[in-house]
Amino acid sequence: MSDNFVSFGEQGAQLTYGSYLRLPQLLEAQHLESDPPAHDELLFITIHQVYELWFKQLLHEVSAARDAMLGGEAGGRLWWAQHLLTRVHVIERVLVQQIDVLETMTPQEFLEFRQRLAPASGFQSVQFRELEFLSGAKDPAYLERFRGITPAEKARLDARLSEPTLWDAFLAMLRSFGFAADSDAEVSAALRTAAHDRTRYAVVWALSEGLLQHDELAANWRARHVVMVERMIGSKSGTGGSSGSSYLRSRLPVQYYPLLWGLRSEL
């Protein structure tokens, strides 16, 4: 055997694949509520835990993209913001595609354990709401409607409400290029200028498109999600007491960046 060959475990024995990824803890985190165990409850739990892991990653990436844009042109990190937004888009496409896996569960199979989920609800996903706040859709009223969240989770939401959003960072970036951006009219004018001179304002245009893509993919997820819910439970109320699919449909018109959408009508 070559002296350069080292078998796994012969060096760095303190760290293994399983210990690095905390696999014992991770793989013990799926606890079924159904009794007797419903076959598809494991699938349901796994998918939602994976969503929460991706939400954590998205918060990490979107926060970093925001911070890079807050530094403006002089900060020299706008390329990094572009790169991170591209990663965000890829992850968000995975989130939409993941619904295909959940739809392999039939309504009958879901009903085998659905009643055991109440009053838990996807509405209580703190990270999902953090992501909306960070993206620009801040709504303090959500904190009043949240039930069952911990003080630490409420503190995280309060922090997101007080910190700059991705849109705030985009406006700061516009100002760093000499644009006025204190009113919707000024921002729209800046966007038109960037759109008509993409050579000079290539980074501005690229970041505006990156934000728009983020917005569009969030809309795609909402649309795909509500159709899945209607396929699964029809018009029934949600397990947390919401109106179910009718509430989800009321969220479909949400836009993080209406000025970017409106720009299309002005070109």
UniProtKB/Swiss-Prot annotation:
Keywords carried by this UniProt record: Dioxygenase, Heme, Iron, Metal-binding, Oxidoreductase, Tryptophan catabolism
One MF term in the entry's GO annotations: tryptophan 2,3-dioxygenase activity
Broad class of enzyme this protein falls into: oxidoreductase
EC number in record: 1.13.11.11
Gene3D superfamilies reported for this sequence: 1.20.58.480
Cofactor (UniProt): heme
Co-factor remark: Binds 1 heme group per subunit.
Residues binding substrate: 44-48, 114, 239
Catalytic reaction(s) noted: L-tryptophan + O2 = N-formyl-L-kynurenine
GO terms (BP aspect): L-tryptophan catabolic process to acetyl-CoA; L-tryptophan catabolic process to kynurenine
Residue positions binding heme: 225
Family annotation (InterPro entries): Trp/Indoleamine_2_3_dOase-like, Trp_2_3_dOase
Pathway(s) of this molecule: Amino-acid degradation; L-tryptophan degradation via kynurenine pathway; L-kynurenine from L-tryptophan: step 1/2
Subunit structure: Homotetramer.
Function, in words: Heme-dependent dioxygenase that catalyzes the oxidative cleavage of the L-tryptophan (L-Trp) pyrrole ring and converts L-tryptophan to N-formyl-L-kynurenine. Catalyzes the oxidative cleavage of the indole moiety.
Family indicated by similarity: Belongs to the tryptophan 2,3-dioxygenase family.
Protein name in UniProt: Tryptophan 2,3-dioxygenase
